[in-house]
A protein has these predicted regions:
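Aromatic- and acid-rich polysaccharide-binding/catalytic face
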Residues: 106-108, 133, 139, 181, ...
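Substrate-binding cleft of secreted/luminal carbohydrate-active enzymes
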Residues: 247-312
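Aromatic-lined carbohydrate-recognition surfaces of secreted/lumenal glycan-active proteins
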Residues: 160-194, 214-216, 236-246, 268-278
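An active-site-proximal structural segment forming one wall of the substrate-binding cleft
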Residues: 112-137, 153-171, 192-208, 260-263
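Boundary/entry segment of secreted carbohydrate-active catalytic domains
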Residues: 32-86
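Distinct, well-ordered alpha-helical segments
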Residues: 64, 90-94, 118-126, 186-205, ...
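Active-site groove signature of glycoside hydrolases
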Residues: 122-154, 178-187, 240, 271-273, ...
C-alpha cells in the first residue's frame, strides 16, 4: 500500500502499505459477515472519512483533477496523503493537488531515513513544500524497505524521530506537526513496535505536536492497540493512514461497517482510504476508487466512488 507518505505532524501509522512505493496494503478486512443488501449513499456518507491516499504520478494528472474535483464538490475529500520521494527535487502532482485546496499529509519516504544529515533533509523539504503542515516520518519502516538495501530497527527509528522532533521544535517552532511511521495493524509486530516507540520517544514529546499513525486493513485485528492508546498514548491524536479492501464490490460495505470499528478501537480521528488509484494491474489495483486514468475522461469509477459523488 502507500507505504510511503505540514507544520510537522509525526503520526505513527499502524496498518499496511502501497504499490510502487511506501504506500501498499499488507492485509485486508473482509466484511463477509456483514448484513447483505445494497449500501445506501446515506450509510456511506455517515461513516466516510474525507481523506484518501494519492500516488504522485504526473502521467494521470487530468484524471486525478477530475476525480478529486468530483469528490471535493460532493464534500467527500478534504485531505490527501502523498509521498515525498528522495529521488525528486519537487513533485508537481503534490503541488497541483495542494493548489486545489486539499490539505496534504506529506509522507517522508523511508529512503530519507538513512540520510546522515536528516536535519538538513527536513529543512529542504520544509522549504520545498511551505504549504504542507503535516509530515509523516516514514511508513512501516521495519518492513517496507528494499530487500538488499539498508534496514532500520524500531529503536533506531525512535532515535531518528527524536532528532527530527527536536530539530523542528528548535529550528522551526510552530511550523509543522509530525506524524509517526505507520505501525502494522495486524499481528503483534505493530503494537510491540509502537510500545517501544512510546517508551523511547513519544512519552517525552508534546502530544499537540505529534500524531500517532496506524495502517489498518483488518479492523478486527486492531484491538491489540487499545490498551496502549487508552494508556500511555491517551493524550495523542490517532490517524489511520491506510485502510480499505481489495474488492470494489465490497468497498462501500467496508466503509459502512468497518470505519466505525476503527474509530471505536483506535480512537481514529481520521481514516485515509487506500487508494485513489493503485495502478491498473498488480496487488493494489482492486483497492482503487478509479482505474485506467489514462483513458480520461472515460476512466473507470468504482461503485464506492459513485456513492460518494452521486455519479452513476
Amino acid at each position: 500500500m502507500l507505504r510511503r507518505i505540514a507544520p510537522f505532524v509525526f503520526a505513527t501509522c499502524a496498518l499496511v502499505g502501497c504499490q510502487g512505493g511506501l504506500l501498499s496494503p499488507s492485509a485486508s478486512g473482509d466484511p463477509g459477515s456483514s448484513p447483505a443488501g445494497p449500501v445506501t449513499p446515506q450509510e456511506v456518507a455517515g461513516q466516510w472519512s474525507p481523506y484518501v491516499n494519492v500516488h504522485g504520478d504526473g502521467e494521470v494528472l487530468l484524471a486525478y483533477r477530475d476525480a478529486l474535483s468530483a469528490l471535493q464538490r460532493a464534500g467527500r475529500v478534504q485531505g490527501v496523503r502523498m509521498e515525498i520521494h528522495g529521488n525528486e527535487a519537487l513533485n508537481s502532482v503534490i503541488k497541483t493537488v495542494g493548489a486545489m485546496g486539499f490539505e496534504v499529509l506529506g509522507l517522508v519516504s523511508n529512503d530519507y531515513l538513512f540520510e546522515p544529515n536528516i536535519e538538513g533533509v527536513i529543512d529542504r523539504i520544509f522549504s520545498t513544500y511551505p504549504e504542507i503542515r503535516y509530515f509523516q516520518i516514514g511508513n512501516e519502516v521495519t518492513t517496507i524497505l528494499p530487500p538488499t538495501g539498508p534496514t532500520i530497527t524500531i529503536e533506531q527509528y525512535a532515535a531518528l524521530f527524536q532528532r527530527i522532533y527536536q530539530h523542528v521544535q528548535s529550528r522551526h517552532p510552530g511550523r509543522a506537526i509530525l506524524v509517526t511511521q505507520s505501525a502494522l495493524g495486524s499481528g503483534m509486530r505493530g503494537p510491540t513496535e509502537l510500545e517501544t516507540l512510546t517508551t523511547l520517544a513519544l512519552e517525552h514529546m508534546d502530544p499537540d505536536k505529534v500524531i500517532v499513525a496506524v495502517n489498518a486493513y483488518d479492523p478486527d485485528a486492531v484491538s491489540r492497540y487499545r490498551g496502549l492508546l487508552t494508556g500511555s498514548l491517551r493524550a495523542f491524536r490517532v490517524w489511520v493512514t491506510e485502510s480499505g479492501i481489495a474488492n470494489p464490490a465490497l468497498q462501500a460495505m467496508f466503509v459502512r461497517d468497518r470505519y466505525p470499528q476503527l474509530r471505536q478501537y483506535l480512537r481514529a480521528e481520521r481514516v485515509y482510504w487506500f487508494v485513489l488509484w493503485g495502478a491498473d494491474s498488480g496487488p493494489d489495483t482492486d483497492f482503487s476508487l478509479i482505474r485506467y486514468p489514462t483513458r480520461y475522461p472515460d476512466y473507470w469509477k468504482s461503485p464506492l466512488f459513485g456513492l460518494l459523488t452521486g455519479q452513476p
